[in-house]
């Protein structure tokens, strides 16, 4: 297995106003976004309840609490933006993984496996009513309830798809004709 190329890039230093410990302690952007959505929905619900409960805003508590929840939701979304702009968290590699071909952290090697193509992969069945204009003249029912056209003769390459499709012949409804 070929070794992955080692990166010689170094992590950028922390911005002057922030330390690395502050960046590590921030919550994930997904958590901030999920909390923001929950608070946003709660704020909208409380605001709508207050808006339709009474028309006097002085004695209507939901009209005060609802917008406060909406401002809190905006704070969560702002935190989501701040958390999503943080750089990658540096991870210390242990000596055990470094010596065993662990590769760079964060990279994944994908390996796809495919099977042989068979006639089953490319077989198509055409379903059409027997009395339609698109059907062939061979639409008379066979010995069974549903009859298939006879199979094509075997060729030298049995796994090549046939050029003509298999046609199902359904019995005709006597009431329709």
UniProtKB/Swiss-Prot annotation:
GO CC annotations on file: membrane
Compositional bias annotation for Low complexity: 128-161
Keyword field: Membrane, Transmembrane, Transmembrane helix
Protein's UniProt keywords contain Transmembrane helix: yes
Subcellular location: Membrane
Region annotated Disordered, chain positions: 1-20, 113-177
Name the record gives this protein: Transmembrane protein 275
Species: Mus musculus
Lineage of the organism: Eukaryota, Metazoa, Chordata, Craniata, Vertebrata
Gene: Tmem275
């Amino acid at each position: 297995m070929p070794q992955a190329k080692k990166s010689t890039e170094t992590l950028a230093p922390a911005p002057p106003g922030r330390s690395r410990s502050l960046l590590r302690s921030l919550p994930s952007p997904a958590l901030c976004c999920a909390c923001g959505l929950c608070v946003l929905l709660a704020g909208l619900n409380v605001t709508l309840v207050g808006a339709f409960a009474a028309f006097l805003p002085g004695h209507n508590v939901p009209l005060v609490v609802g917008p406060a929840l909406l401002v809190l939701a905006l704070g969560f979304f702002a935190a989501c933006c701040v958390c999503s702009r943080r750089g990658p968290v540096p991870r210390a590699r242990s000596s055990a993984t470094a010596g065993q071909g662990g590769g760079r952290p964060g990279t994944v090697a994908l390996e796809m496996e495919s099977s042989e193509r068979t006639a089953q992969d490319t077989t198509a069945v055409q379903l059409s009513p027997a009395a339609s204009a698109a059907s062939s003249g061979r639409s008379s029912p066979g010995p069974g309830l549903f009859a298939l056209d006879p199979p094509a003769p075997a060729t030298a390459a049995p796994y090549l798809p046939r050029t003509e499709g298999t046609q199902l012949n359904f019995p005709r409804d006597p009431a329709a004709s």
